[in-house]
Amino acid sequence: TIAASAVSVGWSNYFVPLIAHSFDIHIPLYLSKGYFAGGFINVPAMFIAALVTTLLALGTRESATVNAVLVCIKVAALVLFCALALPVIKTDNFEPFAPLGWLGIGGAAASIFFAYVGFDAVSTAAEETRNPQRNMPIGLIGSLVICTIFYLLVAGGAIGSIGAQPVLDAAGHGIDPGGPDMMKACVDQAKLSTLVCSDEPLAHVLREIGWPKTSRLIGLAAFLALPSVILMMMFGQTRVFFSMARDRLLPDVLTKIHPRFHTPHVVTLITGTVVMCAAAFFPVGNLADTSNGGTLAAFFSVAMGVMILRRTQRDRKRPFRTPAIWLVGPLALVGCLALFLLLSFFAKMVFFGWAALGLVFYAVYGRKRSTLHPEYVEPLDSK
């Protein structure tokens, strides 16, 4: 849910400059930035979240063809950016290479983890995959390698072409990106024209290196492609809540299906409202870090669960068996924990707050009603 809010704000950050440069329509700051991002309310982010919610409630589904076209648009935009930015790289723009040291690199890694959210969805197809022992690692690792190469090329092109040194506070410490402190520092230090203060970094880079018209194509690509990301995130989340309600972990009203559109409209509208509210008031940096906290905790739990099941259920049928689990598992635990600790204080506090509320809700409401309670679960036939 929070990840969908972050992408909604990201869409807004490209949409506002796009219509400003293309049609000379300027949305004031207080209507294009959330309260905690230096404005009042992010209307474009609310609009796109509301639109996607409506489409989901009406039963609109992405076809494989449409999704493939949108993926091609995203890839084409990144390839175009790299083709224009990489040739004008200046090595001086990488000096100093790590101005905030290893802690700065770690903090950036914790934030950029948001770019890798969703790769785990490939694993859900293990039972439907031919020879999963061979093909699942190829799919997961292959997609990770390809996307990481793109991330490196894009980041290298952006930083190398125009430079991107961090914005520091009065004490010389780096400021968490995307929040009101960053906005204030950018204004006070007159750095709104720099890459680190830009809301649309790739389009900003192309304008700075002499491609203003092409920069609009990048904004247009984001305008067209990002809503599909929001849709898929919200689709998955609503189905998770629907399944939890069906298992009686959440109120039964969330299992209602619309008689005409045959969609779980109640849970969709509630989820969409939460996405809209978060997108309306919070900056993309805080939302992404908050989403990372929950995702890292989920990955940590999965790694721990796999190791426990490997010990307690040795004979369990496994369409895909994690290789070298006693090496991969501990490395995953350490990596997730390290990245979580490097997240912003705000993200960690929000995570612990929501986790506490979830545990209380489960103890008071869900535990007694759940059909997953041991007394309701029928043992599997060993045959």
Regions found by a protein language model. Give the residues of each.
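Hydrophobic transmembrane alpha-helices that form the core helical bundles
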Residues: 1-49, 53-57, 222-243, 277-297
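Membrane-interface loop-to-helix entry segments
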Residues: 12, 40-88, 99-102, 140-144, ...
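Helix-loop-helix junctions that connect adjacent transmembrane segments
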Residues: 23-45, 68-220
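C-terminal membrane-solvent junction of multi-pass transporters and transport-like membrane proteins
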Residues: 37-41, 52, 99, 253-265, ...
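Select transmembrane alpha-helical segments in multipass membrane proteins
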Residues: 44-48, 100-112, 207-231, 264-277, ...
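Alpha-helical transmembrane segments of multipass membrane proteins
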Residues: 53-54, 82, 155-156, 223, ...
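Transmembrane helix-loop junctions in multi-pass membrane proteins
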Residues: 55-61, 90, 214, 250, ...
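Membrane-interface alpha-helices at helix entry/exit sites of multi-pass transporters
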Residues: 132-143, 249-269
